[in-house]
C-alpha cells in the first residue's frame, strides 16, 4: 500500500494499491545500511502538496510481505545487511541475504548463500556450471561483501 505524504506539512493523500512491486533508488539515499534504508521506504513523485506546494513522496507500507526483495546498489557505500526485517502491519518479517551479484569489466559474477550460511562463488566464465565454496556468512563482514574479484556489488537478493 502506498499513500502520498508531504514531509514539510504532514499532509497525507489518498492510498494506492495498484503497484505489484517497486524499484527503489539507493543512490540518492543517505542511509548507512540496508536495514536503515528499508525502515523509511518512500519514493519521490512529481505531484505537489495541495496545502504547501512542497514535493510529495509515496510512503510505502506493506500489507502483505513480499516473497523476495531485490535491491540495487548503484555507486553507493551502503552496507548490505545479512538480515533485514520489514514491518507488516504489527509484525516483522525477517529476510536473509541469499545472493549478491557483482559487476565489473562488462561481466557479472555472484555469491550465493545457502540455508546454512555457506557462501558459494559462481562465475560462468571461470567456474562454468560449478560453484566454489567461498566462506561463511557468519564470518564475512559487510566490507568483504562489497567487492568480489575486482567487481563491485550491484544487487542483493533477500528471501
Residue ranges and their predicted role:
Residues 1-159:
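UBL (ubiquitin/ubiquitin-like) substrate-recognition surfaces
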Amino acid at each position: 500500500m502506498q499513500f502520498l505524504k508531504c514531509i514539510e506539512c504532514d499532509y497525507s493523500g489518498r492510498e494506492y494499491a495498484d503497484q505489484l512491486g517497486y524499484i527503489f533508488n539507493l543512490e540518492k539515499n543517505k542511509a548507512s545500511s540496508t536495514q536503515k534504508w528499508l525502515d523509511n521506504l518512500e519514493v519521490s513523485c512529481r505531484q505537489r502538496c495541495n496545502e504547501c506546494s512542497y514535493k510529495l513522496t509515496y510512503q510505502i507500507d506493506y500489507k502483505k510481505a513480499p516473497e523476495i526483495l531485490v535491491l540495487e546498489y548503484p555507486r553507493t557505500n551502503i552496507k548490505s545487511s545479512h538480515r533485514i526485517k520489514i514491518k507488516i502491519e504489527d509484525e516483522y518479517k525477517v529476510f536473509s541475504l541469499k545472493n549478491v551479484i557483482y559487476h565489473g569489466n562488462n561481466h557479472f559474477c555472484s555469491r550465493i548463500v545457502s540455508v546454512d550460511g555457506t557462501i558459494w562463488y559462481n562465475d560462468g566464465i571461470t567456474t562454468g556450471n560449478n560453484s566454489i565454496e567461498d566462506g561463511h556468512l557468519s564470518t564475512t563482514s559487510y566490507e568483504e561483501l562489497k567487492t568480489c574479484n575486482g567487481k563491485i556489488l550491484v544487487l542483493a537478493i533477500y528471501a
